């Protein structure tokens, strides 16, 4: 007996993906495998988004509005327009700022030297809190007559790290 169906006939074997990736495709995904089909859909969506963003830049659309771009099928993707950030430049008075020029400290170039014995220290120099660089012999504060007050700095650091907590006095009943 011969069985005839009107319209659709099932293919006799599995169909390879049209991108020749080695996987099998289906008629529902345009003879592509699921991976290639998803990649194709993503590329189409990106192309549509790029085209719409270029159109909005060229046409000068408002930055605060949202536009809805129809994607494949019944899905819709809301695309928020990116507001262009403008840089506000305020003109300054050239004559008024000539007296207010801030002095920028010069960075020492050349060989690094000990501030006490003037010995070259290079990369092995020790920076002190007083702002100078010293060799291994003069790196300690008692060896180079350091002007930095370590006692006050330590006292301030401890006070800052451990604040005094005083509770209010309780009323006697």
From Swiss-Prot:
- Keyword Zinc-finger in annotation: yes
Binding-site positions, Zn(2+) 3: 128, 130, 144, 146
Alphabetical keyword list: Metal-binding, Stress response, Zinc, Zinc-finger
Signal is among the record's keywords: no
InterPro entries reported in the protein's UniProt record = AN1-like_Znf (IPR035896), AN1_A20_ZnFinger (IPR050652), Znf_A20 (IPR002653), Znf_AN1 (IPR000058)
- Quick one: which residues bind Zn(2+) 1? 17, 21, 33, 36
GO MF annotations, alphabetized: DNA binding; zinc ion binding
AN1-type Zn finger ranges: 108-154
ZnF regions (A20-type) run across 11-45
**Pfam families cross-referenced by the UniProt entry:** zf-A20, zf-AN1
Induction annotation: By cold, dehydration and salt stress.
Residues holding Zn(2+) 2: 114, 117, 135, 138
Q: What does this protein do?
A: May be involved in environmental stress response.
What is the name of this protein? Zinc finger A20 and AN1 domain-containing stress-associated protein 4
Q: What organism, scientifically named, is this protein from?
A: Oryza sativa subsp. japonica (Rice)
